[in-house]
Design a protein with these regions (language model features):
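Conserved AMP-binding/adenylate-forming
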Residues: 36-37, 53-98
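Structural core segment of the AMP-binding/adenylate-forming
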Residues: 86-152
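Adenylate-forming
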Residues: 17, 27, 39, 43-50, ...
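Short beta-strand segments
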Residues: 28, 69-70, 139-140
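AMP-dependent adenylate-forming
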Residues: 13-38, 61, 145-148
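AMP-binding/adenylate-forming domain of the ANL superfamily
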Residues: 2-28, 45, 50
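Alpha-helix N-cap/helix-start and coil->helix boundary motif
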Residues: 44, 74-75, 100, 122
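Aromatic/hydrophobic pocket-lining residues that form π-stacking "cages" and hydrophobic walls in ligand
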Residues: 14, 80, 125
Length: 152
């Protein structure tokens, strides 16, 4: 059972829901006229894969990474949203309604190292690549077929 006493961190929460609700549906979504579903067990595995990637990046950068999310809420978005803090990083969900200049200003203030983005926002990403030098890596959420294969 998940309680306040046994769930102190996001990591604890992700691990416990994966164990306690392993075979229950976490999310259903439609893509190309097909309905897909992911269970809590799969979500936990994918989120822990993002956490493992984040741990490698923490070592590479020499500090806990600051990762921004630019996109609509979806399965991959949710794995990054909780996966990065599971490894001690910081997740910054960006407001998709902000203009490019404000995004740059906010990302600079937040010292963003990595941007995870939805392919629908590629024009903003191109602008950020040209105008936001603090971001060292750009990862398209849809380019990763299986979240457990996040690029090195």
């Amino acid at each position: 059972m998940i309680t306040f006493n046994n769930t102190k961190t996001i990591y604890d929460l992700v691990k416990r829901v994966g164990t306690e609700f392993e075979n229950q549906v976490f999310v259903r979504y439609e893509k190309d006229d097909t309905i897909y579903e992911k269970g809590y067990g799969t979500y936990t595995l994918d989120t822990m894969a993002v956490a493992a990637y984040t741990e490698r990046q923490n070592r590479k950068f020499g500090h806990p990474i600051h990762a921004a999310l630019l996109g609509k809420c979806g399965y991959e978005y949710l794995t990054v949203l909780l996966g990065v803090p599971c490894a001690g990083g910081i997740t910054y969900p960006a407001d998709i309604q902000l203009n490019n200049e404000t995004l740059v200003e906010n990302f600079e203030k937040a010292d963003i190292d990595i941007l995870f983005y939805d392919r629908d926002f590629i024009s903003q990403v191109q602008y950020l690549k040209e105008n936001c030098p603090c971001i060292k890596k750009y990862i398209c959420l849809q380019s990763v077929k299986n979240v457990r294969t996040v690029p090195q």
